[in-house]
Amino acid sequence: MAGKKAPYGEFAGRKLKLKRKKFRWSDIRYKRRVLRLKEKSDPLEGAPQARGIVLEKIAVEAKQPNSAMRKAVRVQLIKNGKVVTAFTPGDGAINHIDEHDEVIIEGIGGPKGGSMGDIPGIRYKVVKVNRVSLKELVKGRKEKPRR
């Protein structure tokens, strides 16, 4: 006859606690959180936003069944020198961004911190250009400061 798996009894609390602690390591989400793997691999280093310099403007092809060229920029982050691609949301938003502009980027809001919708491999979006909101620039409410 097979024995019982869990320790039962009045004083089994410590043993149960230790057992639970041991088996938590097989949970991937727990492991990634405790070992801080996201912050270590994330270009933004766990921060909600980051500042960077625009290196070039690019167009990325949308995934099937859509057909479009999604406008994006390659940005070099100031804090660690890493280069990431950031989407420029809004109609004609790319026209308000030039090379060597200072931009603020943030996550695009896809599942599990990944890319969103039909834009493949792009995890970030541009929020501000030269300290002015990109949304305001696109709507024509504000003008980009001349340097």
Swiss-Prot record:
GO cellular component labels: cytosolic small ribosomal subunit; ribosome
UniProt-recorded Gene Ontology molecular function terms: rRNA binding; structural constituent of ribosome
UniProt keywords, alphabetically: Ribonucleoprotein, Ribosomal protein, RNA-binding, rRNA-binding
Gene Ontology process terms (BP): translation
Domain of life of the source = Archaea
Q: What does this protein do?
A: With S4 and S5 plays an important role in translational accuracy. Located at the interface of the 30S and 50S subunits.
**What is annotated about its quaternary structure and interactions?**
Part of the 30S ribosomal subunit.
Q: How is this protein named in the record?
A: Small ribosomal subunit protein uS12
User: Where is the organism placed in the taxonomic lineage, from the top?
Assistant: Archaea, Methanobacteriati, Methanobacteriota, Thermococci, Thermococcales
